[in-house]
Amino acid sequence: MVSCAGILKKLEIPVHERETLSFLKNPDLLPIKKEKQTWGFFSNFAYWGIISFSVGTWLSASQALSVGLSYPETIGTFIVGDFVTILFTLANSYPGSDWKVGYTLSQRFVFGIYGSYFGILIRVLMSIVNYASNAWLGGLCINMILDSWSHHYLHLKNTLTPSVAMETKEVIGFMLFHVVTVLCYWMKPYQINYILIISCTATCFSMMGMIIYLTHKAGGVGDLFTSTKSTATGSDKSWAWVYMISYWFGSVSPGSVNQSDYSRFGTSKTAIWTGTILALFIPTTLVPVFGVIGASTSVKLYGQELWQPMDIFTYWLKDNYSAGARAGAFFCGLSFTLSQMSYTISNSGFASGMDLAGVLPKYINIKRGAIFTAVISVALQPWNFYNKSSNVFLTVMSSFGIVMTPIIAVMICDNLVIRKRQYSVTEAFKIKGEYYYFKGFNWRAFVAWICGMTPGLPGMAWEVNNKYFNNKGIVNFYYGDSFFSFVISFFLYWILCLVFPYHVKILHDDKDYFGAFSDEEARKKGMVPYSEISEEELDAYNFPSHKTEGFEKETSSIRKQGVVSSSDGHAYEEKDESDHITKQRIVSTKTSSTSDLQEESS
């Protein structure tokens, strides 16, 4: 009989294939080298554009009537929501653009070396939910391709019972999308920018072509924009506006939280800012309008409102299964599938995979972590998000904001107000360093997050089942949670840091140990350029040398010396860590004792 230890041994990543030395340090955590910072305007535009040119954004306006707003008013709430998203996203991009680090190190900066596990766990959970939602829509896009290939598949009989909120075709498409998407995880995360650009461009032209065809065939855009009226009045209407703004931000909040993961690839702040702003204003406004036009024209053409573009193509093909209609369905289905696939791997699969690889390097690499996310996402039964009730969809999307907005608020406050955009990256790779706080946790950040998130939970429970209670104050707070929770967490964290200050001993690194900046950029930051650091000094600090072939050679050298990741996750000998602390030059003008750094005092 195979023992548990034997099973775990077989599941281990081979040592020569491990992408991690320890939970503290792995290639995906290190600041991006200057030569790999290749994401210009189009890459940054595509990262956010792919979120906009997606099926989820197309059908987003369908929720308008459920909250009592007209379609034009709903588009107005989305524009305001875009403005809010831009502010949050750009403010959260600084760790990536300033220090070329991603989400995980940003969590260490704010929540502490051990407290960062909390932020990682939250993002993994959010990634699983987001993965499930987008994979379901991606499966419907796969069916557009299959419908164009086979008349028999177009009319495939449903063999599932009515109690199941999906059909046989939907199951097939869902599984195929998972298989195709999983194949992408044999790529590396830094290679996806060109896929994002291609997918974004193809989907943009497909959506435009689809709308041009529908309006031409229907003789106009239809009457939905003018025929639907707002049913909410007075304060109810105001709160409906607030709710839709919160819903809109909540639906893209995972992307805002992930911003540092991709802003670190940026060639310049200008490329990051212009790409992000334009992508969040133009397509995120146009695509919901396309969805309304599609539903409006389908009333005249097919006798009912069809919000999902896949349903429109189904009627399209059933009405006329000609070569032209099949070609249109195929190319649109292909572009929509690419869009959903790109969105899924960039915002969910790779994000979760990197987090899990950093936590369990002995058993999980990025590929395994991403595949694990894909498998677990099926258990969420995402077909219920879309096929049962619009309230389910709204609740799922808005729940992202309830959990993530307080995290964003704390991160922005710590970065812009408390530390004023100054972080020591090398200290994030040491246990008892600058970010050890109290026992490895920054309790101020946790208090601020809990106090910002908790008030929105009763409202979310009410949204799921309004028979629990009917307290208007709680419901209204839930509607405006994206605003209220941000303000609560931001200012509470600020106050806690003023009343219980932590001591900043190392303002930022004195040398560019990672080659993340040009010589000129490093000097402007008060750092010795990477080109002027000796190989011996880099070796002493256990950082990749610019005179070697990089991290792989460093990893091999360390393993030969017998310093490998142990079962408790530690990869450094104690004398190396102490030596690093001793050699680190302190650049802050503030003073505090060594004990204050390791065990903060109140």
Protein language model regions, located:
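Membrane-water interface regions at transmembrane-helix termini and the short interhelical loops
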Residues: 66-68, 93-95, 110, 118, ...
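Membrane-embedded translocation segments of transport machinery
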Residues: 61-84, 88-93, 206-381, 390
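Intrinsically disordered, low-complexity terminal tails of fungal membrane proteins
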Residues: 1-32, 502-602
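Membrane-interface "cap" regions at the ends of multi-pass membrane proteins
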Residues: 2-71, 86, 207-210, 214-220, ...
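C-terminal membrane-solvent junction of multi-pass transporters and transport-like membrane proteins
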Residues: 407-491
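Loop-to-transmembrane helix boundary motifs in multi-pass membrane proteins
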Residues: 163-175, 358-387, 434-455
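Membrane-interface loop-to-helix entry segments
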Residues: 133-139, 172-217, 224-226, 276-280, ...
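Juxtamembrane transmembrane-helix boundary signature
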Residues: 78-111, 120-126, 130-136, 498-501, ...
